Design a protein with these regions (language model features):
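Short aromatic/hydrophobic "clamp" motif used to bind/position activated sugar donors
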Residues: 86
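A short, conserved alpha-helix in the catalytic core of glycosyltransferases
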Residues: 166-167, 175-194, 198-226
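Glycine-rich, basic loop-to-helix element that forms the pyrophosphate-binding segment
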Residues: 64-81
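A conserved acidic beta->alpha catalytic loop
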Residues: 17, 39-49
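Short, well-formed alpha-helical segments that are part of the catalytic scaffolds
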Residues: 14-29
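Short, flexible, basic/aromatic active-site loop/helix in glycosyltransferases
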Residues: 135-174
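Active-site-adjacent helix/loop segment of glycosyltransferases
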Residues: 207-261
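Conserved donor NDP-sugar-binding/catalytic core segment of glycosyltransferases
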Residues: 98-130
Length: 261
């Protein structure tokens, strides 16, 4: 859509929920000219790509010849886009149109906000605590350690790390939001060069937030909009994803300094 206001960017790789997600987007948005959907496929299987082609009536789809990761795909979709706002959108998110419209209205009203994130829910309606106030090695140890007695000993620290005390009655400035759903000013995304695509997956969203903060840009959480996220916690279950997570964590701390506690 040449005159769209929002570019909605989705990066896929054999994504489990994508077709349910795309059906939801068709139902919610139809061919609304305010929104342009751009999908970047990271060399999924032939069968998957053939199914994805069925949605070329609602989205511009790039089928790439190799998998260079999450940040690379979103940069490909967005760094040359002309829309005012960019929406980084996971292929496992269910969105109601009115929730996005409320977020756009917030950015329209307050030009000091660079990045806006909503409340993220599980399929059962409970909250996913994905916002972070800090990033430290010890906090990641606590998240991954399998012993509940250790988690209980540091329950207060984990609650603080996961920002479990965020208000439900007002928007609030935060330090780090989740890349599963980020509404950004296009200019600010371009000014920082988009995502650092040296991260294949994981930590590129944290890195983007730190880059924005370094430039005194505001990142805000709104509890008045919500999305449903079919969160897989892949790094907790899959050894290959855990290795990717650890590599990205190493890159992050090498770039921003090692914070142990």
């Amino acid at each position: 859509m040449a005159n769209a206001k929002v570019a909605i960017s989705i990066v896929t790789y054999n994504s489990k929920h994508i077709f349910k997600v795309l059906e939801n987007l068709k139902q919610e948005f139809g061919h609304d000219p305010q929104f342009r959907f751009v999908i970047f496929d990271n060399n999924s299987t032939d069968d998957y790509q053939n199914r994805l082609k069925e949605y070329q009536d609602i989205a511009d789809i790039t089928f790439y010849h190799e998998n260079n990761g999450f940040g690379f795909g979103h940069n490909y979709n967005l760094l040359h886009a002309s829309e005012k706002y960019f929406l980084v959108f996971n292929p496992d998110i269910i969105l109601v149109r009115d929730d996005l419209l409320k977020m756009i209205e917030i950015l329209d009203r307050d030009e000091t906000i660079s990045l806006l994130v909503p409340k993220v829910l599980n399929a059962d309606g409970t909250t996913q605590h994905l916002i972070r106030d800090r990033v430290s090695v010890f906090d990641y140890f606590l998240r991954f350690v399998p012993f509940q007695i250790v988690k209980k000993m540091f329950a207060g620290r984990l609650a603080s790390y996961e920002c479990r005390d965020l208000p439900d009655d007002r928007n609030v400035e935060i330090r780090i939001g989740s890349g599963c759903f980020m509404l950004l000013r296009g200019k600010d995304f371009k000014d920082v060069g988009g995502f650092d695509d040296r991260y294949f997956m994981y930590f590129e969203d944290y890195d983007l937030c730190i880059e924005l903060k370094k430039r005194n840009k505001r990142i805000v959480y709104t509890p008045f909009s919500n999305v449903t996220h079919y969160y897989e916690r892949g790094a907790h279950k899959n050894s290959n994803l855990f290795k990717i997570f650890m590599k990205s964590m190493y890159k992050y701390f090498n770039k921003w300094g090692w914070k142990w506690f």
